[in-house]
Amino acid sequence: MTEDIKEEEVKEEEATETTEEVVEETKEATETTEEVVEGTKEATETTEEVVEETKETSELEEAQARAEEFENKYLRVHAEMQNIQRRAKEERQQLQKYRSQDLAKAILPSLDNIERALAVEGLTDDVKKGLEMIQESLINGLKEEGIEEIAADGEFDHNFHMAIQTMPADDEHPADTIAQVFQKGYKLHDRILRPAMVVVYKEN
């Protein structure tokens, strides 16, 4: 009888110890679960922070892209405005530089007529002197406007001269030199108003 009681007491003690171990393990498991939950919560918060930072970074990059686009548009518009201003300035300069072109076209025929009149024989001294004064006045007026006679002696230059006739070249008159001026040529600064019409020596 006594042995049975002792055996039961031993079983009760073992059961109690087992229960305590189970409780302890349950407690540890609960703590582990809480740690996992806490870790998950922290990970979630970290993920939210990363997402927020990524969102802010994306918005910043988008804002920077828009700023660069606006800057590029401004630079293009600014460059275009500068080109327009430059072209307008060049056009004004060209107009100013060649403003006398129409004047020259109107005066040059009259100057040609005066030269032809002076070549006529039998002019009285007074008439000749009067024509020469008019001629000089016209030439000076043209010079003031930048209009000058093209030199037509020496070698023929197709940039300034127009050959309307040729003559045989010889020892005294080399080929491609000007023999005679049929009509004077004129230029306005660097622009040819009309080439000089000349007779040129050529090899046979």
From Swiss-Prot:
Gene: grpE
Location of the protein in the cell: Cytoplasm
SUPFAM superfamilies recorded: Coiled-coil domain of nucleotide exchange factor GrpE, Head domain of nucleotide exchange factor GrpE
Family statement drawn from the similarity comment of this UniProt entry: Belongs to the GrpE family.
GO biological process: protein folding
Chain positions covered by the region annotation Disordered: 1-65
Alphabetical UniProt keywords: Chaperone, Cytoplasm, Stress response
UniProt-listed InterPro entries: GrpE, GrpE_coiled_coil, GrpE_head
Keyword Hydrolase set for record: no
Subunit (UniProt): Homodimer.
UniProt biased composition (Basic and acidic residues): 52-65
Pfam families named among the record's database cross-references: GrpE
Gene Ontology CC annotation, any one: cytoplasm
GO molecular function, one term: protein-folding chaperone binding
Protein name (record): Protein GrpE
Its biological purpose: Participates actively in the response to hyperosmotic and heat shock by preventing the aggregation of stress-denatured proteins, in association with DnaK and GrpE. It is the nucleotide exchange factor for DnaK and may function as a thermosensor. Unfolded proteins bind initially to DnaJ; upon interaction with the DnaJ-bound protein, DnaK hydrolyzes its bound ATP, resulting in the formation of a stable complex. GrpE releases ADP from DnaK; ATP binding to DnaK triggers the release of the substrate protein, thus completing the reaction cycle.
CDD domains, sorted: GrpE
Stretches with biased composition (Acidic residues): 1-23
Phylogenetic classification of the source organism: Bacteria, Bacillati, Bacillota, Bacilli, Lactobacillales
Domain of life: Bacteria
